[in-house]
A protein has these predicted regions:
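P-loop NTP-binding core
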Residues: 1-175
Length: 175
């Protein structure tokens, strides 16, 4: 995106409007297109949204309510989030049908993965019974390290046959 500040309505604006019970703008005001891909921009406003969501009743459904009218317009809606587990990510999981779990093969990766799977299970039970795990995607794997190999092996040994493990990895090759 050439100039994010020029975007009049971002997902942050939409979520703030939802929190404040304001009417949402029409699709044309916030859906942008580039190279045949439609998207809703983000901005730093999401930091303020995250803080406000913590004080809001029914906060975990805000994003779901925004995206619901778009479900019939698209074959798939991809929600890209930061690797944290705050109110915004809970919203993303509450709105999703499937989640691809990205795992950076580092020392605490398995612990984080186990915790995240527990969170998915809770969200499925309490908020979104459609949610399922599409698979695990290993990312940022430094093929030169034994740690990467060990964690990759642990993920396979622990989850193979239960959860799909995507074959592609982002390799770090430094000269």
């Amino acid at each position: 995106m050439e100039n994010p500040a020029a975007v009049p309505v971002t997902i942050g604006h939409l979520m703030m409007a939802q929190i404040d019970d304001d009417e949402l703008p029409g699709f044309k005001e916030y859906i942008q297109s580039r190279n045949g891909v439609d998207f809703i921009s983000s901005s730093m406003m999401l930091s303020a949204v995250d803080a406000k969501l913590r004080l809001e009743m029914g906060a975990e459904k805000m994003l779901s309510e925004i995206l619901e009218p778009l479900r019939d317009r698209y074959d798939a809606i991809i929600i890209d989030t930061a690797p944290t587990l705050g109110a915004l990510n809970i919203n993303a999981l509450a709105a999703a049908d499937e989640v691809i779990i990205t795992v950076n093969p580092q020392l605490l990766a398995m612990m984080g993965l186990q915790d995240f799977l527990k969170t998915v299970k809770k969200i499925r039970a309490r908020v979104n019974d459609r949610l399922s795990v599409a698979g695990i995607l290993l990312t940022i794997c430094d093929a030169r390290t034994n740690l990467c190999k060990v964690i990759t092996e642990q993920v396979r040994d622990t989850f193979e046959g239960q959860i799909r493990i995507f074959e592609s990895r982002t390799l770090i090759l430094l000269k």
